[in-house]
């Protein structure tokens, strides 16, 4: 590992990791509500919220799959040093996957869990440019009273791919991040078109 590649992570590793973990939990418990991570650090190539999620969630027991756009020496060196996470080239071995919006068109190969242990599925950490610039979609499910309108900017093909692979309780949980913000989409949430 090249020490020149290493950049600072959390200022207060324990408290900041706890804040990041709680934000991720709250995002998945209240799908579609934007969570804010004001003290998230910066790493070139990763939005502050994306980097904070990695620092809070990844460790030696969580193999990470990197989409090609995130598979850089800088990102690898910092995640290996600060998180201790192993990297995998095989989607099926990943506990977490780091993707961009263009990587959402094919979710094949990621572990969707099984009926007995659905919690053993892969969690997708998806970096976007904006969490509020997409067309309005209605989210329903646990943690949402009636329905919630969400404007996450992802390709339409992602929603079709997600729906095609739906087999609750199996599925993929998703944390979308942009800037200092994140939104959770658990496998239990249903997404439909907004009706005029």
Name each region found by the language model.
Residues 1-63, 67-70, 81-83, 179-181, ...:
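N-terminal, charge-rich interaction modules
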């Amino acid at each position: 590992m090249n020490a020149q590649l290493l950049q600072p992570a959390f200022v207060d590793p324990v408290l900041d990791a706890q804040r990041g973990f709680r934000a991720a939990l709250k995002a998945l418990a209240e799908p579609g509500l934007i969570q804010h991570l004001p003290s998230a650090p910066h790493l070139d190539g990763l939005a502050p919220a994306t980097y904070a999620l990695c620092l809070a969630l990844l460790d030696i027991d969580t193999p990470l799959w990197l989409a090609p756009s995130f598979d850089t020496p800088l990102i690898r060196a910092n995640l290996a040093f600060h998180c201790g996470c192993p990297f995998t080239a095989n989607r099926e071995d990943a506990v977490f996957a780091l993707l961009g919006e263009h990587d959402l068109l094919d979710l094949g190969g990621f572990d969707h869990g099984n009926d007995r242990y659905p919690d053993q599925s892969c969690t997708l950490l998806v970096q976007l440019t904006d969490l509020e610039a997409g067309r309005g979609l209605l989210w329903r499910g646990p943690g949402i009273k009636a329905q919630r309108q969400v404007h996450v900017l992802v390709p339409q093909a992602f929603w079709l791919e997600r729906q095609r692979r739906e087999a609750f309780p199996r599925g993929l949980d998703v944390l979308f991040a942009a800037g200092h913000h994140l939104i959770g989409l658990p496998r239990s949430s249903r997404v439909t078109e907004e009706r005029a």
